[in-house]
Amino acid sequence: MGQQVLKSSNEKMEKAVAAYSRELATVRAGRASASVLDKVQVDYYGAPTPVVQLANITVPEARLLVIQPYDKTSIGDIEKAILKADLGLNPSNDGTVIRIAFPALTEERRRDLVKVVKKYAEEAKVAVRNVRRDGNDDLKKLEKAGEITEDDLRGYTEDIQKETDKYIAKVDEIAKNKEKEIMEV
């Protein structure tokens, strides 16, 4: 029973770190990346639809994103959705494709982005710690029910703590790499 709690906690911690990595992909670091548009929803025939489902997105240059809609009539809607998403980007529409030039980041903007990265890192750590707390609670219930001994409880609790430390270190490493990427000029 205790092994199942450990396995479940481990999987949940892995998911928390994966979600953090996906969240960081939307933080732009001066280079063009299609992932900045991941959360942009276009009102397409009355239904909110992700840009990636409506267009081919390419990165021909380090600071340029080209969006080529599959349906040319949706180009205006895509442009409006990008502006409405308030990503600090200015799309230019030439009738067939939308080009987004990424301006060079100022020192102040870089520092702001690092703060955002740190905030996301803290949220990910809290998520990992919540999984630890839930796992420990489940183990205590098993011990109360007599399914595991007090020694087993202590051992499993230590194992969950080791996993927690491992995943928090992973979050710190990911954050450090992203901060380094952002601060590169």
Curated annotation (Swiss-Prot):
A Pfam family this chain is assigned to: RRF
Keyword terms: Cytoplasm, Protein biosynthesis
Gene Ontology MF terms: ribosomal large subunit binding
Localization per record: Cytoplasm
UniProt cross-references to CDD domains, sorted A to Z: RRF
GO BP annotation list: translational termination
GO CC term, one of those recorded: cytoplasm
Region forming the signal peptide: none
Protein's recorded name: Ribosome-recycling factor
Organism: Bacillus thuringiensis (strain Al Hakam)
